[in-house]
Regions:
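Hydrophobic/aromatic-rich effector regions of fungal transcription factors
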Residues: 15-25, 38-76, 87-92, 109-116, ...
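Alpha-helical solenoid scaffolds in large eukaryotic transport, assembly, and signaling factors
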Residues: 11-17, 30, 34
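Flexible, glycine- and charge-enriched loops at secondary-structure boundaries
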Residues: 27-35, 76-79, 230-233, 295
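Alpha-helical interaction elements in eukaryotic regulators
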Residues: 10, 34-37, 58, 79-82, ...
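Central/C-terminal regulatory/activation regions of fungal transcription factors
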Residues: 75-243
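Acidic, Ser/Thr/Pro-rich intrinsically disordered transcriptional activation regions
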Residues: 1-11
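Boundary/linker elements of alpha-helical solenoid repeat scaffolds
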Residues: 23-28, 222-224
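Fungal-biased detection of long, low-complexity, Ser/Thr-
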Residues: 39-45, 49-50, 93, 186-321
Length: 321
């Protein structure tokens, strides 16, 4: 924040980032405040780069937010230009670890990169070594959740058929085969649906219901080898979004935050409409995770981005039902 008062470019880009974030949350577009600060940030960034042979941390932060804005507004060409420019700036300054702001800048760039990878079904540009990292012990966004004692999971409402279903999702993520070809329609087995033979889970409340819809999306895509953004997953993701909108504000325990992150990144990968709404909603939650949780999140989201991209490459062979 201190840098924003000392650097006009940073001042405008922070106000631009805040205004554009509110636009995404509210489903708005074309706010004059957003565009004013965006124009000023671009103008000042261009002047800074032209006037100096070096690139400052505030210049890099400005380019980062410009990339984030274009990515969150699905402006793919503009986002790619800013991303490539940012990558050149970071490399010219010695890489992410050499950036200032006590590590905050490199942390933000990495997180924004993960979000961009999920939205665009592509490899994360930052935060990996030689592209994708393949941990010795594969980790998914569900790993840390399901490793908790059953007593803790049960106290949060994760039990019975729902818990079995989440384990099924986790196992399928760990054993994902990129050579899987698009197959027939998959339907949740009756034993997984427990007391819900018609697939009606709403009576369990929005949190558990959201987990049911997310699990359906995962297994439908993983077992059939089709993209997360396939047409038949759109009904589930719209219901997932409705559940998230109905979450109680006091549902903010450590476990609940991790599940919320999993749900929102699922929605961002799946939705054809309101894709970026999911990332805008989850951003503050990701920033509130502990260092241990963040480490697990980063490993899990890298694996998820890999699967999202591999399944997207199957789109040409997607089976219509």
């Amino acid at each position: 924040m201190q840098a924003s008062f000392q650097d006009p470019c940073m001042f405008h880009v922070i106000l631009f980032a805040a205004s554009s974030h509110l636009e995404v949350i509210r489903g708005e577009n074309g706010n004059p405040v957003t565009h004013y600060h965006r124009r000023q940030a671009i103008k000042l960034l261009s002047e800074n780069i032209s006037a100096s042979r070096t690139v400052s941390d505030t210049d890099i932060a400005t380019a980062m937010y410009l990339w984030h804005y274009e990515s969150m507004n699905s402006h793919l060409d503009e986002a790619r230009i800013h991303k490539e420019g940012l990558l050149q700036m970071v490399n010219a300054n010695g890489g992410l670890r050499k950036l200032g702001f006590d590590g905050f800048l490199s942390h933000m760039i990495t997180l924004i990169g993960f979000g961009d990878a999920i939205l665009s079904a592509s490899k994360p540009v930052f935060g990996t070594v030689d592209g994708y990292q393949v941990p010795e012990a594969p980790t998914t966004l569900l790993s840390a959740i399901l490793q908790r004692p059953e007593k803790v999971l049960h106290s949060s409402g994760l039990n019975g058929s729902l818990l079995s279903l989440l384990h099924e999702v986790h196992d399928n993520l760990l054993t994902f085969d990129p050579q899987t070809t698009p197959g027939d329609y998959w339907r949740m087995p009756l034993y997984m649906r427990g007391g819900y033979p018609d697939g009606n889970f709403e009576e369990d409340g929005p949190f558990n219901t959201a987990c049911w819809y997310a699990a359906n999306i995962y297994l439908n895509s993983l077992k059939r080898g089709i993209p997360f953004s396939s047409d038949e997953n759109q009904m589930f993701v719209e219901k997932l979004r409705s559940c998230i909108m109905a979450f109680p504000k006091d549902n903010d325990g450590e476990l609940e935050r991790e599940i919320y992150v999993w749900l929102c990144f699922t929605g961002a990968a799946v939705a054809k409409r309101n894709k970026t709404w999911f990332l805008a909603k989850v951003g503050p939650t990701v920033m509130s995770l502990s260092q241990k949780q963040l480490g697990e999140f980063k490993r899990g989201v890298i694996q998820f981005a890999y699967i999202v991209q591999k399944l997207e490459s199957n789109r040409s062979g997607e089976v219509e039902v």
